[in-house]
């Protein structure tokens, strides 16, 4: 009687073990099977979308640029002498910091519009592109996006940056107005007799153009970080496709 009662349990154990063995065998066979073109291009597209989405979300959040020293947008190098000398004037340091805050807020506002351009480029990726990216260096995917989107991003991005820096912010003053106030003060000094004798030079920089390139530099830096993470950290590969495609690089 005890044997009869144990038989069903024995069958369950056998069939369960067989199912697990079959699943393990299928996984092993899958891992040994060469990557197909469909898997490669699908995995690369998914990885790029993940990288772009994460990067846009990080930088598009409040203080995404402003409190990240790696991407924080500072005044142009040509303005270093302005910062040094304006800082000597009462309230000068606060004026500089207000401008920096508004500049970075403008970038945080504009970066949200970059994702559709990246997605369009990703959709147009060929198998040749995908294989080259998979077998390329740690920034191969980022370089692909830079090559295929940068000019379009600048063309579409600059008007948005311009609109952002002209947007009224705290105190009903825009970033562009703050920048113009600073540069005007400096240029007045530079053009004065004292300024000329000191060898000061005027600063004439298109703020929106400068900000566009700096904002995009920060975005591509974040995308590169995401790519490195997926390439090197198995835990960052959220789907089975990403695990299979990028897992092929681990061996």
What kind of region is each of these model predictions?
Residues 1-7:
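Bacterial N-terminal signal peptides that target proteins for export
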Residues 14-17:
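C-terminal motif of bacterial Sec signal peptides marking the signal peptidase cleavage site
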Residues 19-22:
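Bacterial signal peptide processing site
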Residues 24-107:
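N-terminal Sec/ER secretory leader and immediately downstream segment
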Residues 59, 92, 113, 143, ...:
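Alpha-helical transmembrane segments and their juxtamembrane interface "caps"
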Residues 97-167:
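Mid-length scaffold segments of soluble, non-membrane domains
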Residues 171-240:
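A structured, mid-to-C-terminal "fold-capping" secondary-structure block
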Residues 250-251:
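Non-transmembrane, aqueous-exposed alpha-helical and coiled segments at domain scale
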